[in-house]
């Protein structure tokens, strides 16, 4: 489907020269003098190469329709990440470039949304929250619990975050998958 360049947004998938690209960022620039342009940063899905393109805002670009489907995470190996569709039991392999910063939060059996073009995954969406265990943090200091200061902690997936003083090593906590920030102590 052909659309004007100014309507392209982050996460869209474009086809250019027979190759698929996922949009990382799109910005419309309106200089005081001259023609407005759309600055678009993209990543080629096939090999992960990043490119930057400039289009006039009225130029036509080929936008590809993608389908979002739920998949369960199975495992990771040297070739990539493996997911299974719960209804059909079809398995799909996703490259490290597509998974990107979501990799540390993937847990066996976790249901994620994969944006698919034909049989190729082009993007991944994690659940908003994940439950992880604190594997290393400073011990609780008496009298420090009244202040609203946070202390550094390392989670079971290797991510570093800030936690309240009452959280100790071995405690399971809920974090946002978007940035790894602390939400609450896990209820389980």
Swiss-Prot record:
Keywords: Cytoplasm, Elongation factor, Protein biosynthesis. It is found in: Cytoplasm. Gene3D superfamilies: 2.30.30.30, Nucleic acid-binding proteins (2.40.50.140). It comes from the Bacteria. InterPro entries: Elong-fact-P_C, NA-bd_OB-fold, Rib_uL2_dom2, Transl_elong_fac_P/YeiP, Transl_elong_KOW-like, Transl_elong_P/YeiP_cen, Transl_elong_P/YeiP_CS, Transl_elongation_fac_P. One of its GO terms (molecular function) is translation elongation factor activity. The keyword Nucleotide-binding does not apply. Pathway: Protein biosynthesis; polypeptide chain elongation. GO terms for biological process: peptide biosynthetic process. One of its GO terms (cellular component) is cytoplasm. NCBIfam families: efp, PRK00529.1. Involved in peptide bond synthesis. Stimulates efficient translation and peptide-bond synthesis on native or reconstituted 70S ribosomes in vitro. Probably functions indirectly by altering the affinity of the ribosome for aminoacyl-tRNA, thus increasing their reactivity as acceptors for peptidyl transferase. Belongs to the elongation factor P family. This is Elongation factor P. It comes from Rhodopseudomonas palustris (strain ATCC BAA-98 / CGA009). The gene is efp.
